Amino acid sequence: NNSSRSVEQYVKKLEKMGIPAAENDVLLSTHDCIAWLNRNNVNETYCVGTEGMRQMLEAEGISTRSTQPQYVVLGYDTETTYERLEKASLHLHAGVPLMASHPDMVCPSPDGGLPDVGAFLALFKATTGVEATHISGKPNPGMILHKIEELGLKPEECAMVGDRLYTDIAMANRANCM
């Protein structure tokens, strides 16, 4: 559910760890976000997300810095600025709907939890009164079902291993995986 890096960045990270990987081996909540935006014909957004996330959206023809966005898109933005949050808030006050890449409240770190997308969703609700109309990523079963189909498998032939019951295991249950 981490949308802070692009697929290319994750492949490089895995390779540095000695794990060979190709881009099609990596599945991110950003993929689910892009699929949802495309299904809903959204190509003008204001994205609160990292450069890696914005590059993935832009590569799919989705503008991420529109002055007249169809949606404010919220990802795990480890590079955010007050100005970015302010612009997103103003769009939300103007009636632009909000969608998010995933619901996680906390991103674990060795030194303690860090604010993740869910925490920023709470911030926007508190400051603008706006709640997300859609949240992509886990626990949405669509996050994994398209990959299962692409691999020619059935959900009941797949098992999920994860560290969070409310995202990883909930998604597996909703997708009818083991």
Regions found by a protein language model. Name each.
Residues 1-178:
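HAD-like aspartate-dependent phosphatase fold
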